[in-house]
Amino acid sequence: YLASFNANQRRNIRRERKAVQQAGLQVSAIAAEAITPELLARMHGFYEDHCRRWGMWGSKYLTEEFFSLAQPLRQHLVLFSAHRQGEDPHQPIAMSLCVREGDHLWGRYWGSTVEIDNLHFEVCYYAPIEWAIAQGIRHYDPGAGGSHKRRRGFVARPHASLHRWYEPQFAGLIKRWLPLANAQQLEEVEAVNAELPFSGRQIPLAPEQGKIEG
C-alpha cells in the first residue's frame, strides 16, 4: 500500500498513524461472531452522535432498529474499535462500521467521543486497509464523497443513483439538466484522479462521458 505513493505522501501517512499511537490509542478489528449486541449498540451511539454534530447535513440514514437487526448478519460485519492502549477493545472511544462480502470491504459510518488529530483517518482508512490486506481482501471502498480520500489513495469513481420526482414540471427541468450535471461530475472525477499522490502508477480515470446515462 505505502509503496504505491510518492515519498512525501508515505511520510504523511506514517506521521498520521504515529500521531494516533502517541495519543495512547490503538485500533482493533472486531469481526463476525466476536461482535456483540452491546458493541452494535455502541456503534449506533457513535453514529447518532456524529450525525447530530453535523446538524441538517448529518445524513442520518440508519436507525437504532437497523443496528439491532444487524446482529444476525454479523458474519458480514467488521467493527474497528479505537481504544486506550492495553485496554479492552469493547470499551472504545471511537468506532467505524464496515461490511464485508467475499474479497470486498465497504466502509462508511463512524463516530468518536473525543477529538484527536488523525483518528478519523486511522479508524476509517488505515486500520481497515491494513486489516483487509491481512485478510486477502482486494477491494476497499470507504464510501462516497470527501476530498481527503484521494490523499489516502482512493481513486474517484462515478456511481449511478436513482431518483423520482412526483411533480411533472420539476421532473422535466431536472431531466434536461442531468446530462450537463453528469458531464461536470465526470470532469471532476478526472481532475481529482489527476492529483492522486501515486508514484509512477497508472491511475484508472473516469469512463467516457457516454457511459453514464442522463
PLM segments and residue spans:
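Surface-exposed beta-strand edges and their flanking turn/coil or helix-capping segments
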Residues: 3-5, 40-43, 108-111, 120-122, ...
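Short, surface-exposed linear patches
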Residues: 11-17, 50, 66, 128-131, ...
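Short C-terminal domain-edge/linker segments immediately following a structured domain
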Residues: 20-24, 58-61, 114, 126-130, ...
